[in-house]
Structures are given as structure tokens and as C-alpha cells.
């Protein structure tokens, strides 16, 4: 009896059979009813077969690939915990950067998982559906590994105990939350422009490189490891972001003005969101990697400039107000740290005045702005603290209606003047931090008048109290004086000094970084 050896499928054919060949054309239901949001935004798709799949993975390959990474990752997590790896970090102040990451970035990734799970259902093209499904699983995995990486710190440091609860409530966490809420309430193509292109492709290096490099410079091997584990995923996500934009632009010329408007909007929203990351780089890392100004120059001005030059042939120009970011990179991190320093009664992490070494580093990195505009402010606050009059602002800051950051930024052409824009819509006045946010509101006022602004809600009595202290403890679940306020002399600082066998200083040191080990 003759036997026939069946030829094995190559990877390309296997991928096609297990993804696109599982799709079908609708018959007993109208295609418009099955995919109702595909035409919602005015994007015209003429041929889904032109979609170039960026992931090129089948599910069985995906699970095998990720399982191998998980094994190595959790082995390192276990070793880190068993060897008390938290004792090897540069200084306890570094953990405050992790608190910011866990409360602001990890829930953002979970929202991305929810968003990709939803929009993947909205595309009639099988390639796009599979890509969104893969990225949804990636984002969920990132949340899990980040939480597991930082869970060890929760045993030894304050402020990491209730990140999911805080994300929906704390005033400065409404910045990342409002970004993703905005994206998830848009149509499917705008969501991919917001997350896959504007954030994952254009700006993601400004998020992950500072955090992972900062972790390496400060002895945090757990965070470095999950960063490396996510790196290959992020490469696929960036590829998807570029493919999305090029695919839409190549499908129909009518898509160009719609996409340009989205790029203008989401670039500005991403830039404002990353202000928190820039502040972390410049102020929260005891051992610093690079300044925000340097990072913006490398990862956006150089890399982003080349990208938009490439997109010129499709009729796409650089984002609106991009020139303001070149000016703002010299100012925004100092302004935000100054705001969080004075409003730290309502944060879940500690703040402090940089020591002289750090102030000198900032002077070196920002030679045209720091000594002139910001160093005198920090030195004055340090003098006040030395006299026992550490400055706290007993109010809460006024928030921008769109990005929800405090309105504390200055005019692009005048660093001594606050930037404030306002307009009246249907008899109600709304305020904004910049021209960029004001323009976004003008294009979609019906959306942004519904924004849930934490400070407004607190003062209206909708947050379990009308005063800051009650809201912080009851509504935010933050332990006042333990999770927040000044780092110097805090319980966390005292424990770190005891661990290192040091004696606590009586005042903020003027000649070196605080409590550096």
C-alpha cells in the first residue's frame, strides 16, 4: 500500500490558514450591521486584503513564545524576592517612581487591553482583528507582570497598596485615565491612531526607556526584567502603529484630513501625559539616566522628525504645535514637580527638594532655564523647610478641561506668565492649559464638557468629604503622613536609614542627595 507524505505547511501558509482563511463574508446579516462602527468616523477602506499583518503569529506560536518568556521572567522575580532585592536599590526615594508607574501606567495598560479587545471586534478585515486580539493579550500580560514585579516592594514600602482604587479617583491620575477614556470612547480607527500610532509608535520610547533605564541605574532588577520581557511585544506594537497609519492613508485620499486631525490631537494629548514621565526622570530617580530635554530631543525630535518626513508623501505634516514642545521641554518637568511638591498632601508618594548635586545636574542639563527660573524657587523652599516651615498648598489645583493636568504651565514665549485659555460653550466657561488643549475642545465640545474633573468633584462634595484631608483618607485610601507628604523624616525614610545603619539628618541636606546610600 502506497503512503503519501503530506507536505508540511510553511509558516506563511500556516499563518494564512489560521487567520485570514477563518474569516468569511456575511450573508444573512448586512455587513454594516455586523460591523456598525467601521464607517462611523468617515474612514474609507477599499480593500482589507492590502493590510500587512505586523504580528504574523498564530495563536499556538504566540502562546509558546510568551510561555518561554514567562518562565524566565518569574524565575528572576522569585530570585529578587528571596534575596531581598529591594535592599539593593540606590535609595528609598526611587520607590516613589515605582508608585507613580504602578498607579498611573499599569492601569493605563489594562485600559489598552480593554480598548483593543473592543475595537478588534469592529473591523471586517481579519488581519486587523487578529492584530488587535494579539495586542490585547500583550497588554493584559504587561499589567500582570508589572503588578507581580512590584508586589515585593509593597511588603516593604508605603503607597503601593491600592493602585486600582486610586486610579479612578486621585486627581493627578485622571491625566492617564482621561487619555485612555478619550481613546476608548472614540471610533475604532481613531483608537488605533491614538494608542497604536501616537503613543506606541511615536511616544512609547519616552515612556519605557526612561523607566527601564532608570530601574537599571538604580539597582531595580525586577523592573528591568519585566521591561526586557515586554520589549519584543512593544516592537510588534510599534509596527502595528505604523501599519495602521499607512494602511488608512493608502486606502483613500479622503482619509488624509481626518487622520491629520487625529495626529494633531493625540500627539498633544500624549505630550501632556508624558509630562509626568519627564518629571519622574528629572526629579524622582536618585541615579539619573538622562534629562527629559535630552530624551525628547533623541526620541521625538530626531526619530519623530524622520517619521513625519516619511509621511509627507501621503500629505501628512508634523503635528500642530510641535514647535511649542521644543520650547516646553526646557520647562515642563520643573513646573510639574513644583506643583506636586506643594500639593503632596493629596498624592500617594513622597516629594522632596533636590540636594545640591541634583540641582547642579539640573543646571547642567537645562543651562538656559533652570538657574534663571526654577533653582531660586527650590532653594527658597529648602530654606523654609530648614526653618520648620515646609511649604504645603492647602487647596487643590485648577485642572485643564482636556488633559486634566493642573493649569501650571507657562506661555511658550514668556516663562514668567501662566498659560491659561478659556472659552464659553452653551453658557458655561471652560479653562485650558494651552492652545493645543483648547483646540481639541473646540473640535469636540460635546465630549469634553462631560469630563469628570476630580478637583471640581471634590469641591462639589461628591467625594466623601469637602476638605482635602477627609477626601485623601476616605476616598483616595491614602494614609496621610505615611504614604504622602515630605520624604525627609517620613516613616519610609526612617526605615531605609535603619536598614542602612544611618542616622537621620535633622534638616534637608544642602550638599548631597537626600539620604543616598
UniProtKB/Swiss-Prot annotation:
Binding site for Fe cation 2: 139, 200, 234, 237
Sites where the protein binds Fe cation 1: 109, 139, 142, 234
Cofactor note: Binds 2 Fe(2+) ions per subunit.
Pathway(s): Aromatic compound metabolism; phenol degradation
Class of this enzyme: oxidoreductase
MF-aspect GO terms: metal ion binding; phenol 2-monooxygenase activity
Superkingdom per UniProt: Bacteria
Any Gene Ontology biological process: phenol-containing compound catabolic process
Inhibition and activation profile: Requires DmpM for efficient turnover. The activity of DmpLNO oxygenase is inhibited by dithiothreitol (DTT) by a mechanism apparently involving H(2)O(2) generation.
Protein EC: 1.14.13.244
Mutant phenotype after disruption: Cells lacking this gene cannot grow on phenol.
Catalytic reactions on record: phenol + NADH + O2 + H(+) = catechol + NAD(+) + H2O
Cofactor(s) for this UniProt protein: Fe(2+)
SUPFAM superfamilies: Ferritin-like
Protein's job: Part of a multicomponent enzyme which catalyzes the degradation of phenol and some of its methylated derivatives. DmpL, DmpN and DmpO form the oxygenase component of the complex. Required for growth on phenol and for in vitro phenol hydroxylase activity.
Quaternary data: The multicomponent enzyme phenol hydroxylase is formed by DmpL (P1 component), DmpM (P2 component), DmpN (P3 component), DmpO (P4 component) and DmpP (P5 component). The oxygenase component is a dimer composed of three subunits, DmpL, DmpN and DmpO (DmpLNO). DmpN interacts with the auxiliary protein DmpK (P0 component).
Protein known as: Phenol 2-monooxygenase, oxygenase component DmpN
Originating species: Pseudomonas sp. (strain CF600)
Organism ancestry: Bacteria, Pseudomonadati, Pseudomonadota
Gene name for this UniProt entry: dmpN
Amino acid at each position: 500500500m502506497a503512503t503519501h507524505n503530506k507536505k508540511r505547511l510553511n509558516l506563511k501558509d500556516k499563518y494564512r490558514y489560521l487567520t485570514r482563511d477563518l474569516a468569511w463574508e456575511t450573508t444573512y446579516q448586512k455587513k454594516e450591521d455586523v460591523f456598525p462602527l467601521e464607517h462611523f468616523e468617515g474612514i474609507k477602506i477599499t480593500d482589507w486584503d492590502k493590510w500587512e499583518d505586523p504580528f504574523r503569529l498564530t495563536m499556538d506560536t504566540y502562546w509558546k513564545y510568551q510561555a518561554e518568556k514567562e518562565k524566565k521572567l518569574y524565575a528572576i522575580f522569585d530570585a529578587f524576592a528571596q534575596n531581598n532585592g529591594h535592599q539593593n536599590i540606590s535609595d528609598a526615594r526611587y520607590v516613589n517612581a515605582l508608585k507613580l508607574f504602578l498607579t498611573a501606567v499599569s492601569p493605563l495598560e489594562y485600559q489598552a487591553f480593554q480598548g483593543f479587545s473592543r475595537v478588534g471586534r469592529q473591523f471586517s478585515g481579519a488581519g486587523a482583528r487578529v492584530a488587535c486580539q494579539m495586542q490585547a493579550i500583550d497588554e493584559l500580560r504587561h499589567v500582570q507582570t508589572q503588578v507581580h514585579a512590584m508586589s515585593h516592594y509593597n511588603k516593604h514600602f508605603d503607597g503601593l497598596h491600592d493602585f486600582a482604587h486610586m486610579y479612578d479617583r486621585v486627581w493627578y491620575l485622571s491625566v492617564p485615565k482621561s487619555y485612555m477614556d478619550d481613546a476608548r470612547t472614540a471610533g475604532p480607527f481613531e483608537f488605533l491612531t491614538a494608542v497604536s500610532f501616537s503613543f506606541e509608535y511615536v511616544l512609547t520610547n519616552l515612556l519605557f526607556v526612561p523607566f527601564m533605564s532608570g530601574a537599571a541605574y538604580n539597582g531595580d532588577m525586577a523592573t528591568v526584567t519585566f521591561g526586557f520581557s515586554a520589549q519584543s511585544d512593544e516592537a510588534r506594537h510599534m509596527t502595528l502603529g505604523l501599519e495602521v497609519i499607512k494602511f488608512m492613508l493608502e486606502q483613500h485620499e479622503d482619509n488624509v484630513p481626518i487622520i491629520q486631525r487625529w495626529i494633531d490631537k493625540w500627539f498633544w494629548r500624549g505630550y501632556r501625559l508624558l509630562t509626568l514621565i519627564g518629571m519622574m526622570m528629572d526629579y524622582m530617580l536618585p541615579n539619573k539616566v538622562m534629562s527629559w530635554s535630552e530624551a525628547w530631543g533623541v526620541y521625538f525630535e530626531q526619530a519623530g522628525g524622520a517619521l513625519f518626513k516619511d509621511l509627507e508623501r501621503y500629505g501628512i505634516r508634523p503635528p500642530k504645535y510641535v514647535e511649542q514642545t521644543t520650547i516646553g521641554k526646557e520647562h515642563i518637568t520643573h513646573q510639574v514637580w513644583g506643583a506636586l511638591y506643594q500639593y503632596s498632601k493629596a498624592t500617594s508618594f513622597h516629594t522632596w527638594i533636590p540636594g545640591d548635586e541634583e540641582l547642579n545636574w539640573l543646571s547642567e542639563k537645562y543651562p538656559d532655564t533652570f538657574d534663571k527660573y526654577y533653582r531660586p524657587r527650590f532653594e527658597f523652599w529648602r530654606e523654609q523647610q530648614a526653618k520648620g516651615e515646609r511649604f504645603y498648598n492647602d487647596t487643590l489645583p485648577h485642572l485643564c478641561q482636556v488633559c486634566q493636568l493642573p493649569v501650571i504651565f507657562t506661555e511658550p514665549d514668556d516663562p514668567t506668565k501662566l498659560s491659561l485659555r478659556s472659552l464659553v460653550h452653551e453658557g458655561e466657561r471652560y479653562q485650558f492649559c494651552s492652545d493645543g488643549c483648547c483646540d481639541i475642545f473646540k473640535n469636540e465640545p460635546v465630549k469634553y464638557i462631560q469630563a469628570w474633573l476630580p478637583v471640581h468633584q471634590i469641591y462639589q462634595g461628591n467625594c466623601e468629604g469637602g476638605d482635602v484631608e477627609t477626601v485623601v483618607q476616605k476616598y483616595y485610601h491614602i494614609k496621610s503622613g505615611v504614604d504622602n507628604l515630605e520624604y525627609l523624616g517620613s516613616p519610609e525614610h526612617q526605615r531605609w536609614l535603619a536598614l542602612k545603619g544611618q542616622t537621620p539628618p535633622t534638616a534637608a541636606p544642602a550638599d548631597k542627595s537626600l539620604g543616598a546610600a
